[in-house]
């Protein structure tokens, strides 16, 4: 489908710059869902949708195109199934998580062409899906959701991520979708040539991230403690939202803070 044929809302525009290898979708109001703006994503590109909750996977799961939607986690698979399994106008096919021993069922569903076929599959389950009788990749468009995880998970799920990267071009067309894209220079080599498609929204507030480099010998816990303390004591304005992927280390920092600030937020002793 030509780029301009994808547009539903007349306020939307799509521009392609072949020299820079980019596509720009000017989507307008960020409160609108993508399914109200475009019919489908452009083919064969890496898409930065920039915001979450705009209905990227909903768009492809509810349109009239046969799709395989790859998700990195079982919980995401369950969520997509729960949101769409009740719809009568599409045929939802599941592979991964609790839906692993269902080759015969999938083969039967694949044979039903009366409505669009939508396969939701985990990264881990793609190799098994490719072997199922009746599954022909060339009959489907592929969406790799949370595409940045191909880099993030690559260190400990390398075979699964590599399988996707070596097989995505067996599909009729493909889209790599994320709201938090990997920097272009760090793209895996096998998708580094793809056009970068950016969805621009009119009324999105820019979020500023302040990078803090740690001096040699300074632990993450010490740095985090000092950062939290600065906010709690009013030295830094605003709110701090922190993600730290360790319950043990979070507990230690909280214990340190409680000795100085207290669990009620009041200073227990002065800090120099």
Regions found by a protein language model. Give the residues of each.
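Inter-Walker segment of RecA-like/P-loop motor cores
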Residues: 87-131
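Conserved small/polar residues in nucleotide/adenosyl-binding loops
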Residues: 271
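SF2 helicase catalytic motif II
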Residues: 124, 134-166, 173
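Conserved Walker A/P-loop ATP-binding site and its immediately adjacent core
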Residues: 56-97, 183, 246-251
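Interdomain hinge/linker at the junction between the two RecA-like core domains of SF2 helicases
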Residues: 181-231
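Walker A/P-loop
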Residues: 42-61
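Pre-Walker A adenine-sensing motif
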Residues: 9-42
């Amino acid at each position: 489908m030509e780029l301009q044929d994808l547009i539903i809302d007349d306020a939307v525009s799509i521009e392609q710059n072949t020299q820079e290898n980019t596509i720009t979708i000017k989507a307008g109001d960020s409160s609108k869902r993508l399914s109200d703006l475009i019919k489908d994503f452009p083919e064969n590109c890496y898409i930065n949708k920039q915001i979450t909750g705009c209905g990227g996977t909903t768009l492809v799961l509810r349109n009239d195109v046969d799709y395989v939607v790859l998700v990195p986690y079982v919980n995401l698979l369950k969520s997509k199934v729960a949101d769409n399994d009740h719809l009568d106008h599409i045929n939802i096919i599941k592979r991964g998580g609790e839906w692993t021993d269902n080759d015969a069922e999938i083969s039967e569903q694949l044979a039903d062409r009366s409505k669009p076929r939508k396969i939701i599959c985990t990264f881990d389950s793609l190799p098994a899906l490719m072997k199922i009788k009746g599954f022909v990749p060339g009959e489907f468009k592929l969406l790799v959701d949370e595409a940045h995880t191909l880099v993030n998970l690559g260190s400990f799920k390398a075979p699964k991520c590599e399988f996707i990267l070596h097989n995505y071009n067996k599909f009729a067309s493909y889209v790599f979708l994320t709201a938090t894209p990997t920097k272009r220079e760090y793209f895996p080599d096998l998708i580094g040539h793809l056009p970068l498609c950016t969805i621009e929204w009119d009324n999105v507030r820019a979020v500023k991230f302040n990078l803090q480099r740690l001096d040699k010998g300074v632990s993450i816990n010490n740095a985090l403690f000092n950062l939290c303390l600065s906010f709690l004591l009013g030295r830094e304005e605003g709110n701090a939202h922190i993600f730290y992927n360790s319950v043990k280390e979070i507990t230690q920092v909280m214990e340190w803070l409680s000795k100085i600030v207290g669990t009620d937020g009041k200073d227990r002793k002065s800090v120099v």
